[in-house]
Amino acid sequence: MIMSSYLMESNYIDPKFPPCEEYSQNNYIPEHSPEYYSRARDTGYQHHHQELYPPRASYQERQYNCASIPEPDTPRGHGIPQSAHLLTGKGQPASCETPQLSMSPATPPAAASACNQATPEHPNSTASSKQPVVYPWMKKIHVSTVNSAYNGTEPKRSRTAYTRQQVLELEKEFHYNRYLTRRRRIEIAHALVLSERQIKIWFQNRRMKWKKDHRLPNTKVRSSSSSGSNTSSAAGAVAAASATNTGAPDELTGAQHAEDITRL
């Protein structure tokens, strides 16, 4: 019943919305006309709402005005007072966002000027960033340690100059062991302050020199000569077997010829 009487009231004032042309670019909706707020409501509408909700003492009688609201006491030095947020005049709002909007277009030129000032100081920064950085470990290096004065080119192999003490210790080790194990090689490298690669190369060269001094055949040459002798002996055996096989049929033919003569 309450809703039906509410809808059937002919004196109910419909809300009036302004046309779309009055909207500004900042999506600000202007206020309604003072006539919309000043008109009194119908008694029947108030009567039904008084039955549902208890009435308030000063809500219907007191008229609020945006310009007559007292300003609260604000401490000094705390920014813009609250009166700037209230409505002044005939619906012209005083918004605190206006200084921000006015200052915002000025900030990008300042940033652009700062970038323009920074670019002359480093003109080659963009050119260097485009070129890939090539580190020393990305190139092939034959030396064991990286030289501090590396200029980007591949250095040549340098011949290791062993000291007299290092050569003496290596000769002693070679006298007892011509071939080193990995563990013994690491121990000698730490003792003589050399790398494992240098120890390995020195022992390879020393073994070749020892074979040359003692006139020992090379391992590869000896294996090829032994394989050649094996092939020659196998060929001789095959030839002998073929000779014996060819001689046997001749003897058989001679015996058969003798038997034929006796029969005649």
Curated annotation (Swiss-Prot):
Record feature DNA-binding region, as residue ranges: 155-214
Reported function: Sequence-specific transcription factor which is part of a developmental regulatory system that provides cells with specific positional identities on the anterior-posterior axis.
Organism: Takifugu rubripes
Disulfide topology: none
Protein name: Homeobox protein Hox-C4a
Placement of sequence motif Antp-type hexapeptide: 134-139
One GO cellular component term noted in the UniProt record for this chain: nucleoplasm
Biased composition (Low complexity): 102-114, 223-248
Composition skew (Polar residues), residue ranges: 115-131
InterPro entries in the record: Antp_homeobox_Deformed_sf (IPR050609), HD (IPR001356), HD_metazoa (IPR020479), Homeobox_antennapedia (IPR017995), Homeobox_Antennapedia_CS (IPR001827), Homeobox_CS (IPR017970), Homeodomain-like_sf (IPR009057)
Keywords linked to the UniProt accession: Developmental protein, DNA-binding, Homeobox, Nucleus, Transcription, Transcription regulation
Gene Ontology MF annotations: DNA-binding transcription factor activity, RNA polymerase II-specific; RNA polymerase II cis-regulatory region sequence-specific DNA binding
Region (Disordered) residue spans: 68-131, 213-264
Family label: Belongs to the Antp homeobox family. Deformed subfamily.
Keyword match rRNA-binding: no
One GO BP annotation of this record: positive regulation of transcription by RNA polymerase II
Compartment(s) of residence: Nucleus
